[in-house]
UniProtKB/Swiss-Prot annotation:
Protein name: Filamin A-interacting protein 1-like
InterPro entries to which the protein is assigned, alphabetical: Cortactin-Actin_Reg, Cortactin-binding_p2_N
Organism for this UniProt entry: Mus musculus (Mouse)
Chain positions with Phosphoserine modification: S789, S1050
Domain of life: Eukaryota
Chief subcellular location: cytoplasm
Gene3D superfamilies, sorted: 1.20.5.1700
Keywords: Coiled coil, Cytoplasm, Membrane, Nucleus, Phosphoprotein
Record bears the keyword Magnesium: no
Compartments (UniProt record): Cytoplasm; Membrane; Nucleus
Coiled-coil positions: 139-583, 610-780
Amino acid composition bias (Basic and acidic residues), ranges on this chain: 50-62
């Protein structure tokens, strides 16, 4: 305030010059106005006298003023007024104190500025005055002080927070320091462990170097042995080349033979084609005859239908004409009656005319009668016309009848002709049926021929395939020659390569030393990386452990909460059950109270109102309390439901937590796997660190290179060995091919024989056809030989009984099971041969296990399969008068007790022998004789077939051949492979005989005892022992005794069951017999059977079973001491 007063006091003397300046400006304004009007100057200077003059001279000068003058005066007055207002404002502004102005405007400035502002406010006519500005800032200052206090308080709070955070950071830093110290300790321990491992690995490397030196010495020894083997292999390769050349020469010879065989096969194919063409021509002729017969029958049936239709039409026309005749005859009778009446009327007229002429009657009656008579005459004339017409119609009808009678006669003649034709056609139909039967039989024969041709074509295809295989084998052999040559060149180049490799090895060692230095630097960098990786892994494991502990704590808490909630739920459920029981009790009470109320109201309506109201109030209060309790219970139930919902939510949360726990567990496992992987990498890096020394690594590299060299050499040696094995296999193949070639030649010969038989049959058929044509021409020359006689004339078919298929006798396979165990056969003791009551005797021989089955499957040629759909295993048993027949038996149904005669008569001059097997009764149809002439030129493999003289229905026979060999004989690889060929399952095909056979079962074991190599071959030609059984199965089988002998001389044994055993002794063999059991009709499955073994597989006979007999003469000239062998040849 002092400053304001002092400013006011100091500014007071300064106002005087301001005022003087303001007055000067007013005077200037006045001068400007007076310049416009000079008269006003005087008035301005002396206003009072002008006014006085105007007042004095008013009446004299008022009329002299014009309108413009008045307007000028008014404008002067306005200017004066404005100037007065301005002066008043200036004066007011000058009069106001400076302090008031400062208080009004709120700032301290020079006084002139404040006065100017005040003047402007007066001119603008603003608010006259305002409040004091110095009062507001004090309130605002108080507010500012309060705000400063609040901000001070907040700053203090923030400072406290900062202090707390600072303390926390200090604590964390201390914890981190502690953890760092622990980590450093662990890392020191880890480094110590690594150093220990380094030392251990160095020791291991020292041991390895020592072992490598030993290995190098061993490898040098091996290299020496390998070089020796190389020299041997080179010599062996040269031997193989020589053998291959020899084999190629043999293959060329075989090619020539195969070409000859192919030419013969082509010739047979040409013959077959001619036979097929003839058969096709006969089929075409048969089809033409059938077509002609069909056309004739169709024409005959059409003509017959037309004639029958005509006959029916004529019958209907005859009936109509007869009806018309009957009607006309009736009309004729009527007309005759009318004629009679007319004649009577004419006679009456004549009488009347006579009377008229005489004049007997009167005119009037006469005239009436005459009129009536005229009318009658007119009617009669009309009837006469009708009669004339009827007579004409009768004439026409008679003519038609005559024509129809003529036609009916013609038709009768035609019907007679047709009946004759019908009889002729019926005869033709009979002839057609017979011809159809004949055609059917011809078709059957043709189909059989087609089947045979198909089989021949299949065999030719198989031959072509075999030829192709042989060509492929030749190509393989050529390739093997080329490969052998290449291998020899490679062996030469290998020696050069080894020398070059030694030179390159020294250079590679230098390069490896350079690489070692680079790898050491890389190892250091990788070690640094590994340390960082380990730190990260340790941190991750800590995090994983923390997360595990947190998850376990959460799980524990959640399980606790869940258990508590379950307990609470159980308690609440019990409470709820109690409350529900209470509610039901209260409801029952309410119902009883309501009933009581009703009774009470009924009984006590007449009592006092006060008592009733009090009781009612009490009861109402009770009801209200009960209702309140019910509401409380409802609320509790709602709370229980809410708690159940919460429990469900907690269970869901528990499941989610379990899932999280499982996920965290998986993460922890993954991290542990990564840790293990890192540890493995660390181990690898440690190993790399251990191999720092250049000398050790040089030795290691050299070792690896030497190992690679030795592996390369061993591989080459193995390859050479494999090639040698392949050459051995090719040798085996060639041997097998030779055997197959011989078999194929046999099959070709058999096929040629078959083709000849087929040609003979076709010629016989053609002769029979020509004969039947001749018969048909002789019987019916009008039909041009179209009819063929009955099929019984030329058919060779024999009625056979159906063979009942029975299950095979598995008990007879016991010797097979006993014979083969672990790939070797048991050796039978000689003591067992002397025991006649032994149940089972096993033929044993030793088989080498080196024969491989898959190799033999390729080499095996199966026997011919069956042509008809019979069982595949070939095990069929037939019944003969109720008794089971074994699969190898040929049934001869003759009376039991009759003997069978076998006569062997050798001729020593011509080196031949004849074998006759006859039955005594030739009168019966089942008797038979079979004879054979056996040439013997001293060779052990002479064969001859026994041709049967009588035909009987064939039954499947299963003859099993036994291959026998000396126990001490050794086998070459070729014989091993050929021996194993019988073990393939492809030989188990069913075989059906087509031709008729002798009713004798021949179980044979044939072979040559001369060569030990051929003793292992499965073919029946090359088996070394001889044992034959001729068996005739009768209707009844009685108990029988079986005799055996081990003598070298031949023996013929007859038994009680009509079996004839011809045993031909050999010094190496022991006999084979089936189990000796009495076979009765009640137990047919125990039928005795004698089986042979062919390496554990059963061979089967094919469609022809022919016996071959080999005779080897002995030193004695006696006829009974020649050794005879009967064996089966498989076609």
């Amino acid at each position: 305030m002092r400053s304001r007063s002092s400013n006011a006091e100091g500014s007071a003397p300064k106002q005087i010059p301001r005022h003087s300046k303001f007055q000067d400006s007013i005077q200037d304004m006045k001068h400007r106005t007076h310049k416009k009007d000079p008269s006003c100057e005087s008035e301005g200077v002396l206003p009072r006298p002008v006014s006085e003059k105007s007042h004095t001279g008013k009446g004299h000068h008022t009329e002299d003023l014009s309108r413009d003058d008045l307007l000028f005066l008014l404008s002067i007055l306005e200017g004066e007024l404005q100037a007065r207002d301005e002066v008043i404002g200036i004066l007011r502004a000058e009069k106001i104190d400076l302090a008031l102005l400062e208080a009004q405007y709120g700032f301290v400035t020079p006084k002139k500025v404040l006065e100017a502002l005040q003047r402007d406010a007066f001119q603008a006519k603003s608010a006259p005055w305002q409040e004091d500005i110095y009062e507001k800032p004090m309130n605002e200052l108080d507010k500012v002080v309060e705000k400063h206090k609040e901000s001070h308080r907040r700053i203090l709070e923030q400072l406290l927070m900062v202090e707390r955070s600072h303390r926390q950071t200090i604590m964390e830093m201390e914890e981190e320091k502690r953890k760092h110290k622990e980590y450093m300790k662990k890392s020191d321990e880890f480094i110590n462990l690594l150093e220990q491992e380094c030392e251990r690995l160095k020791k291991l490397i020292d041991q390895e170097t020592a072992s490598q030196e030993k290995k190098e010495q061993e490898k040098e020894k091996r290299i020496k042995t390998l070089k020796e083997e190389l020299t041997k292999l080179k010599s062996f390769a040269l031997m193989v080349v020589d053998e291959q050349q020899r084999l190629t020469a043999q293959l060329a010879l075989q090619r020539q033979k195969i070409q000859a065989l192919t030419t013969s096969a082509k010739e047979t194919q040409g013959k077959l084609a001619l036979a097929e063409a003839r058969a096709q021509e006969e089929e075409q002729k048969a089809t033409r005859l059938e077509k002609e017969l069909q056309t004739q029958t169709t024409e005959f049936h059409q003509n017959q239908d037309k004639i029958m239709a005509k006959l029916t039409n004529e019958d209907s026309q005859n009936r109509q004409l007869r009806q018309k005749l009957a009607a006309l005859s009736r009309q004729i009778d009527e007309l005759e009656e009318t004629n009679r009446s007319l004649r009577k009327a004419e006679e009456e007229l004549q009488d009347i005319k006579d009377k008229i002429n005489k004049g007997e009657y009167g005119n009037s009656g006469i005239m009436d009668e005459v009129d009536e008579l005229r009318k009658r005459v007119l009617d009669m004339e009309g009837k006469d016309e009708e009669l004339i017409k009827m007579e004409e119609q009768c004439r026409d009808l008679n003519k038609r009848l005559e024509k129809e009678t003529v036609q009916s006669k013609d038709f009768k003649l035609e019907v007679d002709k047709l009946s004759v034709r019908i009889t002729a056609l019926e005869k033709l139909e009979d002839a057609l049926d017979k011809s159809k039967q004949e055609c059917y039989s011809l078709k059957c024969n043709l189909e059989k021929e087609k089947m045979t041709t198909k089989q021949l074509s299949e065999e030719l295809e198989s031959l072509n395939a075999r030829i192709k295989e042989l060509e492929a084998i030749e190509s393989r052999l050529e390739k093997t020659e080329i490969t052998l040559k290449d291998d020899l060149t490679k062996l030469k180049t290998l020696t050069v390569m080894l020398v070059d490799e030694r030179k390159t090895m020294s250079e590679k060692l230098k390069q490896t030393e350079d690489k070692l230095q680079s790898t050491t630097s890389q190892l250091q960098a990788e070690q640094n990386k590994v340390t960082t990786v380990t730190e990260k892994l340790i941190e991750e494991t800590k995090r994983a452990l923390k997360s595990k502990t947190d998850a376990e704590e959460k799980m524990y808490s959640v399980t606790k909460e869940r258990d508590d909630l379950r307990n609470k739920l159980k308690a609440e459920e019990e409470k709820g059950h109690d409350l529900l029981s209470k509610v039901t009790i209260l409801k029952n009470r309410l119902q009883s109270l309501e009933a009581i109320e009703k009774d009470f109201v009924k009984n006590k309506l007449n009592q006092d109102s006060s008592k009733s109201t009090a009781a009612l109030h009490q009861e109402n209060n009770k009801i209200k309390e009960l209702s309140q309790e019910v509401e409380n219970l409802k609320l509790k139930l709602k709370d229980m439901k809410a708690i159940e919902d919460d429990l469900m939510k907690t269970e869901d949360e528990y499941e989610t937590l379990e899932r999280r726990y499982a996920n965290e567990r998986d993460k922890a496992q993954f991290l542990s796997q990564e840790l293990e992987h890192a540890k493995m990498e660390l181990a690898k890096y440690k190993l790399a660190e251990k191999t720092e020394s250049s000398h050790e690594q040089w030795l290691f590299r050299r070792l690896q290179e030497e190992e690679a060299k030795s592996g390369h050499l061993s591989r080459e040696v193995d390859a050479l060995k494999e090639k040698i094995h392949e050459y051995m296999a090719t040798e085996d193949l060639i041997c097998h091919l030779q055997g197959d070639h011989s078999l194929l030649q046999k099959k070709l010969n058999q096929q040629e024989n078959r083709n000849r038989d087929l040609g003979r049959e076709i010629e016989n058929l053609t002769k029979e056809l020509e004969r039947y044509r001749h018969f048909s021409k002789s019987l019916r020359p009008s039909l041009n030989g179209r009819r063929i006689s009955d099929p019984q004339v030329f058919s060779k078919e024999v009625q056979t009984e159906a063979a009942d298929s029975e299950p095979p006798d598995y008990k007879s396979l016991i010797p097979l099971e006993r014979a083969v165990i672990n790939g070797q056969f048991y050796e039978e003791n000689e003591d067992q041969d002397d025991d006649p009551n032994e149940e089972e005797s096993v033929l044993s021989f030793r088989c080498s296990q080196s024969s491989s089955l898959p190799m033999n499957r390729k080499l095996w040629i199966p026997w011919m399969k069956s042509k008809e759909g019979h069982p595949q295993n070939g095990k069929i048993q037939t019944k003969s008068n109720g008794n089971f027949v074994q699969p190898g038996d040929l049934v001869l149904s003759h009376t039991p007790g009759q003997p069978l005669h076998i006569k062997v008569t050798p001729d020593h001059i011509q080196n031949t022998a004849t074998l006759e097997i006859t039955s005594p009764t030739t009168e019966s149809p089942h008797s038979y004789t079979s004879t054979a002439v056996i040439p013997n030129c001293g060779t052990p493999k002479q064969r001859i077939t026994i041709l049967q003289n009588a035909s009987i229905t064939p039954i499947k026979s299963k003859s099993s051949t036994e291959s026998l060999m000396n126990l001490e004989q050794s086998m070459s690889p070729v014989t091993m492979a050929t021996f194993a060929r019988a073990q393939t399952p492809e030989s188990c095909g069913s075989v059906t005989p087509e031709r008729t056979m002798s009713p004798i079962q021949v179980l044979a074991m044939t072979g040559s005892p001369s060569s030990p190599e051929q003793g292992c071959s499965p073919e029946p030609i090359e088996i070394s022992a001889k044992h034959a059984i001729f068996r005739v199965s009768p209707d009844r089988q009685s108990s029988w005794q079986f005799q055996r002998s081990n003598s070298n001389s031949s023996s013929v044994i007859t038994t009680e069951d009509n079996k004839i055993h011809i045993h031909l002794g050999s010094p190496y063999m022991q006999a084979v017999a089936g189990p000796m059991r009495p076979a009765s009709p009640s137990a047919p499955l125990q039928d005795n059977r004698t089986q042979g073994l062919t390496n554990g597989a059963l061979n089967k006979t094919t469609n022809k079973v022919t016996s071959s007999i080999t005779i080897t003469p002995t030193a004695t000239p006696l006829p009974r001491q020649s050794q005879i062998t009967v064996s089966n040849i498989y076609n």
